[in-house]
Amino acid sequence: SANLQSADLQSANLRSADLRYANLQSADLRSANLHSANLHSANLQSANLQSADLRYADLRSANLHSANLQSANLQSADLQSANLRSADLRYANLQSADLQSADLQYAYLETGERFSEYLETVVPALLTAAGKTVEQIVAAGAWDCHSWTNCPMAEAFGVHQEEDCPPLLRPRVRQFVALFDAGLIPCPIATAEEG
């Protein structure tokens, strides 16, 4: 595996590069083209990936602890089991990214708040935005579903697709669905079975 620790790769064209297990700790990858790059299990701790193109990149099990991903394009990237702890994802494009089992503890989300703040304040506010209580949404079995038939957003807004949600809230609904489908949003209240 390549050792590129602290390397200056700003604006580098690494499209489709095979960087599996590479050491890119503290590397400067600002505005780098990493479209479709294979970064499986790469060490990108504290790397600067601001405005990098990571569309369709394979970042499974990558270490992105404390990485700067501000304004990075992670559309359709595979971030399964990635360590994003304390990473900065403000203004990043996470559309269709796979975040299954990713560690977002202390991470800043693309909307500017820390993941913990998102869970504590944004999730309850979004769930209750249309007038239902969190308890009503949970009681409807919304945390048992990962489709638009009765997922939390379907229950909260009485809709079956994102486009039917209030326009002002669609970006937040999209964000919630991505994080929920990745299993990263726990049920906000204990159910009777857990209880």
Give the positions of each predicted feature.
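Intrinsic low-complexity/IDR segments
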Residues: 1-5, 21, 25, 35, ...
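Extreme N-terminal basic, low-complexity initiation segments
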Residues: 2-12, 17
